[in-house]
């Protein structure tokens, strides 16, 4: 099994010092990251995550996507596959939209990606919390396991299983994390995202890309007993000031060494 990790200057330092090893560096294809992308590609293939089209399952600009640019970018950065968030946002719909219409549109968007890109296509499960609703307009329909399974089954899309997102959704929906995970199409998992979460006053859980706790490693091991992904990607760390307080070099090193050992077993 291969290992990926979010780009950060701390990751680059660890790689250059031969302290850790990863197979992929994850980063979005945005102009503000041009230098980081160049450095990353000089060291490892890049797991592209974001191409600048505001990609999501209910994106209304799907007809404007430049597929040549998409495929050229994937090829140039040696990304093995590409994923889009399986997100349905309130701002994408009229108030009277039906659940059936939303599901149909998400499936059509997924099929458009599958039909037009030259690598395997994945959909990523979303987190569901008050901040995801308030800031991003996330609708509960897109985090329901039977909907995720339906779209994967009908379109043959692979699943990018984000364990932190699943934890957030399960907790904030009053469901056990293992029960929630078991309902997802684990047979379709091609990549796993893993990172620590943040608890708000002992009630709500949020995805803040923090250090993994022991519970996170336990959930990962359980998931790996149920599926066989190609890649595990650690999402701790990132570029710039936004991630500076959660890109501790020693914390990153310790997590990666542990994940390297896990990957060697599979």
Language-model segments: what does each one mean?
Residues 2-36:
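N-terminal ordered "arm"
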Residues 132-135, 163-164, 170-173, 204:
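A short secondary-structure junction signal
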């Amino acid at each position: 099994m291969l290992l990926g990790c979010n780009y950060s200057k701390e990751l680059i330092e660890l790689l250059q010092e031969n302290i850790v090893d990863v197979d992929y560096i994850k980063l979005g294809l945005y102009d503000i990251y041009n230098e980081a992308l160049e450095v990353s590609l000089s060291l490892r293939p890049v797991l592209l995550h974001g191409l600048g089209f505001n990609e999501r399952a209910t994106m209304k600009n799907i007809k404007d996507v430049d597929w040549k640019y998409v495929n050229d970018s994937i090829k140039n950065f040696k990304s093995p596959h590409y994923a889009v968030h399986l997100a349905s946002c309130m701002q994408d719909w009229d108030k009277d939209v039906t659940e059936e219409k939303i599901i149909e549109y998400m499936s059509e968007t997924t099929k458009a990606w599958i039909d037009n890109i030259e690598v395997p296509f994945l959909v990523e499960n979303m987190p569901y919390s008050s901040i995801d609703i308030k800031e991003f307009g996330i609708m509960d329909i897109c985090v329901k396991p039977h909907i995720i399974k339906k779209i994967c089954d009908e379109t043959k899309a692979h699943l990018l299983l984000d364990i932190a997102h699943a934890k957030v959704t399960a907790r904030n929906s009053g469901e056990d994390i293992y029960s929630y995970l078991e309902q997802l199409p684990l047979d379709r998992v091609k990549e796993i995202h893993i990172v620590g979460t943040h608890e708000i006053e002992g009630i709500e859980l949020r995805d803040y890309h923090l250090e993994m706790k022991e519970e996170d490693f336990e959930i990962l091991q359980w998931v790996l007993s149920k599926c066989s992904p190609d890649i595990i990607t650690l999402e701790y760390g990132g570029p710039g000031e936004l991630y500076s307080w959660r890109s501790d070099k020693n914390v990153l090193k310790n997590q990666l060494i542990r994940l390297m050992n896990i990957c060697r077993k599979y």
